[in-house]
């Protein structure tokens, strides 16, 4: 049985700083982007402002669209195409910079020069009022701070068990992500 991975609440800055990737195995491997802030992301939830989109490619009508997503910490490209028809339709209708909440898959591409390019392929896009955008951003920051607290504890207490961390309220995926982040981003 397949399941959808949880969408990690992250900022543009956290996405921009996530340069380590874990690739799964098997017939349909799942890739995860590891954040130095303690997230192991396949899907993300982001909140900020989307710029008006532009078509990519030469198809007529366009089958792939790109926009720029900006939050108080930075900006990241957001895309949608034929495999995400609802998100593509939602993205195409944005006429002016608009506060939005987006759920999508994170994608890391390394160019020939080995420079990392990170984008989010939107699954859903929802235009929101500024008050809702601020509330979602506050929730994202709370999650980031809680994950950083967990990272600090795992770093200071390397022998602490997953059961002890879970009993203290840390969600299982956060524990796995914290350990992976400390392994990939040693301090």
Give the residues covered by each predicted segment:
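Hydrophobic residues positioned within well-ordered beta-strands of beta-sheet architectures
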Residues: 46, 65-67, 102, 118
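Short, surface-exposed secondary-structure boundary micro-motifs
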Residues: 49, 105-106
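Structural detector for short beta-strands of small beta-barrel domains
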Residues: 41-61
């Amino acid at each position: 049985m397949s399941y959808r991975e949880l969408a990690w609440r992250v900022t543009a800055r956290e996405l921009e700083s996530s340069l380590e990737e874990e690739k799964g195995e098997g017939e349909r491997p799942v890739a995860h982007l590891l954040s130095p802030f303690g997230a192991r992301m396949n899907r993300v939830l982001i909140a900020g402002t989307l710029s008006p989109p532009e078509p990519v490619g030469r198809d007529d009508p366009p089958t792939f669209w790109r926009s720029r997503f900006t939050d108080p910490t930075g900006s990241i490209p957001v895309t949608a195409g034929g495999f995400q028809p609802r998100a593509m339709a939602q993205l195409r209708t944005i006429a002016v910079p608009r506060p939005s909440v987006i759920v999508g898959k994170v994608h890391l591409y390394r160019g020939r020069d080995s420079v990392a390019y990170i984008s989010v392929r939107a699954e859903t896009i929802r235009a929101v009022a500024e008050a809702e955008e601020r509330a979602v951003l506050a929730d994202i920051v709370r999650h980031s701070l809680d994950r950083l607290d967990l990272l600090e504890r795992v770093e200071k207490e390397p022998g602490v068990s997953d059961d002890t961390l879970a009993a203290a309220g840390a969600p299982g995926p956060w524990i796995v992500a914290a350990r992976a982040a400390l392994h990939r981003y040693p301090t």
